[in-house]
């Protein structure tokens, strides 16, 4: 039962990012990111990472609320463009949903996906098992697992934030 809950949450996670990537207006892009961030926190909490999920929810989504509140105020439109108002945007949204549906059907038929990585033992690295170590709390072990197993995730996230800052500086420069 828990596998299906994680599977449904993962599908909603990807659908939220499909909605974000085909955003026609900044308001709807923010909604897609907030939905995906909340569902991602639910996935983390499902793997008994309650502290990490709560911190991501409070810090990440709290910061996003401020940023998207500011961008929505700066980019207000009288009639914001929705997904169905532009054929190209709607086509990208439908194509993304179709690809996610194909992946879901493939996983339900085959049982696993091993395209670039093998995801069969996902519970082994999401949150460390700390039952044997009585001296460490789950929170400290969770943060250390982020920097040990999730090293490439931290590197990619840092690089993405750097590129985002450069893009924002170029856009605001106006040149």
From Swiss-Prot:
GO CC, one annotated term: mitochondrial inner membrane
Keyword RNA-binding: no
Catalytic activity line of the entry: a ubiquinone + NADH + 5 H(+)(in) = a ubiquinol + NAD(+) + 4 H(+)(out)
Main location: mitochondrion
UniProt-listed Enzyme Commission number(s): 7.1.1.2
Subcellular location: Mitochondrion inner membrane
Assembly notes: Core subunit of respiratory chain NADH dehydrogenase (Complex I) which is composed of 45 different subunits.
Role summary: Core subunit of the mitochondrial membrane respiratory chain NADH dehydrogenase (Complex I) which catalyzes electron transfer from NADH through the respiratory chain, using ubiquinone as an electron acceptor. Essential for the catalytic activity and assembly of complex I.
Family from the record: Belongs to the complex I subunit 6 family.
Protein name according to UniProt: NADH-ubiquinone oxidoreductase chain 6
